[in-house]
Regions:
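Short, small-residue-biased leader/transition segments that mark boundaries at the very start
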Residues: 2-7
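Membrane-proximal helix-turn-helix segments that form the acceptor-binding/catalytic region
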Residues: 52-56, 106-123
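Conserved donor-binding/catalytic core segment of Leloir-type glycosyltransferases
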Residues: 162-179, 185-189
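Short hydrophobic beta-strand element within catalytic cores of glycosyltransferases
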Residues: 256-259
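Conserved acidic donor-binding segment of nucleotide-sugar-dependent glycosyltransferases
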Residues: 270-282, 289-293
């Protein structure tokens, strides 16, 4: 039984990069309610309006469980609700760990998290590493690993044409500071005979200057999977992560995974066992060169990890247990 069989409503906000057809990605049983005043950046007037908006939504639908996702919703929600209804919060990467913010702002984010952590709410992290950070803020913390929908992904893979291709390294996502396009470019420059593909687009595309890099632009899901299927190595040099779905999907597709040594990545990838965890440019280069040899044992290990731990069936079962335990207290 999936969560959609029981938990039916979701309040959400739209970002600039949200696709126009975003509703198509949700199970039809889920009733979506837009929080119109919710925004990612700090805006006192809109944040106060969002505070009252979510309280109004809560009063109207009378939920059995409230689950807040990401820092902004976590702050507003934990202040807005009194904890009489079982409440959970998932950071998806703490803001105070994000290196694109200045130190003073990161300290402010940590103070906000520390204050909100005192509310009657359980933090459910999406990886072991994030859970360890949560325990520094509150003892009311647990974790459920992110997971992928294997059946949905396999259906797309089965319809995807596999073609002859040169040895190819790819990544997927927005070309932004977090995803570290500068390091991606340095690695590509160090391996001029290897083809690199960035599936996606973004404001920092100008940093991808190496001649052996192809930028696909924004692609729909089936197109993105087609690029991935016809590649060999998944490269994720991020500055920080929660627990990236793109990594889990690449593991399922039996791609050799080469990732940066940050929370989320290193929780899933164990160096030399099911992928490579790297810090310096030369580490990434060496790992990619190794991937041109025999890596079947490594990729099979990663694939088995997805089957056992990082899929939506396991994830839904764990969330359901936590929700039901909280409701029965």
């Amino acid at each position: 039984r999936g969560l959609g069989d029981v938990y039916k409503r979701q309040a959400y906000a739209v970002r600039k990069q949200t696709p126009q057809n975003y509703k198509d990605y949700f199970d039809k049983r889920i009733h979506l309610i837009e929080v119109k005043n919710f925004g990612r950046v700090i805006d006192p007037a809109k944040d106060i309006a969002a505070f009252f908006e979510v309280k109004k939504i809560e009063a109207k639908i009378k939920p059995d469980v409230i689950h807040l996702h990401s820092s902004k919703a976590g702050a507003i929600g934990r202040v807005a609700f009194n904890g009489k209804i079982p409440m959970f919060y998932t950071p998806h990467g703490y803001s105070f760990l994000m290196e694109n913010y200045k130190p003073m702002k990161r300290r402010m984010f940590k103070v906000i998290e520390s204050v909100c952590a005192k509310r009657n709410c359980t933090t459910i992290s999406c990886s072991v590493g994030e859970h360890q950070e949560s325990l520094k803020l509150t003892k009311h913390a647990t974790y459920v690993n992110n997971g992928i929908n294997m059946a949905e992904l396999q259906e797309i893979i089965d319809k995807t044409e596999k073609v002859e291709h040169p040895f190819t390294v790819y990544t997927l996502g927005r070309i932004c500071y977090q995803k570290n396009p500068t390091l991606f470019n340095e690695i590509a420059e160090s391996l001029p005979d290897v083809k690199f593909v960035w599936i996606g687009d973004g404001e920092l595309r100008d940093q991808l200057t190496s001649e052996n890099i192809e930028i696909t632009g924004w692609a729909d899901r089936s197109t993105a999977i087609r690029y991935a299927v016809n590649a060999d190595v998944f490269l994720l040099p991020s500055r920080w992560e929660g627990l990236p779905i793109s990594l889990l999907e690449s593991m399922y597709m039996k791609k050799a995974c080469v990732v940066s040594n940050v929370i989320g990545n290193r929780d899933v990838i164990h160096n030399g066992e099911n992928g490579f965890v790297c810090t310096k440019v030369e580490d990434f280069v060496k790992a990619i060169e190794e991937c041109q040899g025999e890596v079947e044992k490594l990729t099979e290990h990663a694939y088995q990890d997805i089957l056992k731990m990082y899929n939506t069936k396991v994830m839904a079962e764990q969330y359901s247990k936590k929700y039901e335990t909280a409701m029965n207290r």
